[in-house]
Design a protein with these regions (language model features):
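Immediate flanking context of iron-sulfur cluster ligation sites
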Residues: 29, 97-112, 150-164, 256, ...
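Iron-sulfur cluster-binding electron-transfer modules in prokaryotic oxidoreductases
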Residues: 69, 177-402
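Conserved glycine-rich FAD pyrophosphate-binding loop
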Residues: 2-106, 125
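Glycine- and acidic
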Residues: 2-9, 43-47, 102, 118, ...
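Ferredoxin-type iron-sulfur electron-transfer modules in oxidoreductases and energy-metabolism complexes
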Residues: 14, 59, 80-104, 114-115, ...
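Generic beta-strand/beta-sheet core signal
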Residues: 2-6, 36-38, 75-77, 110, ...
Length: 402
């Protein structure tokens, strides 16, 4: 079991003292048991070693310690400790995170999440984000100013978190620190930004058209001033090799097994490198070659799974777009009669989570592996391929299939 003790208050420290004394009395005096199993004696159990082993045995331990380490340099205060309240010293306050994302209160700061995090080494790891948030929560509860920590946390804790959830795959208790970050982003978002997000959600087709025009204008400017100067002028937003926008592909097959294909907005916004075909056109061609008759819902340019809004902390707008997409997919799939395929793993995971199996949604990776490969005759090519297993595909367990 996991319990989170807030050591920021004296009454909670006293409560913990009474708990430890009661547990030790129950185990040692009532059942003549051992206070430790696979774990060794640490500072938390050092005051109770004499209770467990008896005064005579504990005296022998102290004599041996004195012989080998008379200055007390080796592991001081562990096992042998004359302070009966050593387990109550230097306790770290762990205030509750509140209602933003309560599961972070279960974090024991083990650090298993750190190797999974894309931003670990750049700014903070998930463990460090949680620890920093706890300190900010403690300061707020104590009426203290957040100080430099509060300013630094905006970039190091919030802006650089990918919100991918890979930390949850390694966490012993399944904590997704990205959920906390998105909630905090939502708390901190300005009124103007929230209004713009609401407008984008309500007029997504127009927003996408505007973004397409901006990308086209960027390519025009790049042709005039060059990519390096444009990159500097845009503050690094414009990158060399920025793809051109391409429209969603059109299905042509009229016979075959029906499958609903939703071209996600990222694929609609950014086309493939010239002269390769657009992602949606490629997916449709492969589906048709495998004997499927793809159904592309009408009005896809106005549709979005909501992932882009959720990443910014706009939870209501994200759910709005997910619900709109669900309604369209339900009609297109004849109430779930036909499978539904999405071509971006982040969007697939978003809709799988939102729908909770109300509709048969498949990521293109799993559908290609499970449904397309058995129908296709493949010709292998001895050419190198760069394979990137992204965060969402990894969370859905598609490594082997990819």
């Amino acid at each position: 079991f996991v319990f989170t003790q807030d050591f920021g208050r004296a009454e909670e420290v006293d409560r913990y003292r009474r708990l430890m004394e009661a547990v030790c009395e129950l185990v040692v005096q009532r059942y003549d048991g051992s206070l430790k199993a696979e774990h060794g004696t640490g500072r938390n159990m050092a005051p109770f070693v004499e209770l467990e082993w008896g005064t005579k045995a504990y005296g022998l331990m102290k004599d041996i310690k004195q012989l080998f380490d008379p200055e007390g340099l080796l592991n001081p205060g562990v096992i042998i400790n004359d302070d009966p309240e050593a387990h109550l010293r230097n306790l770290k306050p762990m205030p509750a995170a509140g209602q933003l994302y309560a599961p972070v209160d279960r974090c024991i700061e083990c650090g298993f999440c750190e190797p999974q995090c894309p931003s670990h080494g750049l700014t903070l790891s998930p463990r460090q984000r949680i620890v920093s948030w706890r300190e900010l929560s403690r300061r707020e509860a104590a009426g203290e100013a957040p100080g430099e920590l509060g300013k630094d946390y905006l970039y190091m804790g919030l802006d650089t978190c990918a919100g991918c959830g890979l930390c949850a795959t390694a966490c012993p208790v399944g904590i997704d620190t990205g959920t906390l970050v998105r909630a905090v982003r939502g708390e901190n978002i300005s009124g103007v930004a929230r209004q713009l997000g609401r407008m984008a959600a309500n007029h997504f087709g127009a927003t996408q058209a505007l973004a397409r025009s901006a990308i086209k204008a960027g390519h025009l400017a790049e042709a005039i001033v060059g990519p390096r100067l444009l990159g500097r002028l845009s503050g690094g937003a414009w990158k060399a090799g920025m793809p051109h926008p391409q429209p969603a592909g059109r299905a042509t097959a009229v016979s075959g097994d029906k499958v609903v294909y939703f071209p996600t907005c990222s694929g609609r916004m950014f086309g493939a490198d010239t002269p390769e075909a657009a992602l949606s056109a490629t997916v449709i061609r492969v589906l048709e070659r495998a004997g499927y008759a793809p159904i592309v819902p009408d009005g896809v340019d106005a549709l979005c799974c909501g992932q882009s809004f959720a990443s910014k902390g706009l939870a209501d707008e994200a759910d709005q777009k997910s619900a709109e997409l669900e309604a369209v997919l339900r009609r297109a799939s004849d109430n779930g009669r036909y499978p539904i395929v999405l071509d971006a793993s982040a969007c697939s995971l978003r809709m799988k989570t939102f729908l909770a199996e109300r509709l048969p949604v498949f990521d293109i990776v799993e559908f290609a592996h499970d449904a397309l490969l058995p129908r296709l005759m493949l010709q292998k090519k001895a050419e190198p391929v760069l394979l990137h297993l992204n965060c969402s595909a990894s969370r859905m367990g598609f490594a082997a299939k990819l």
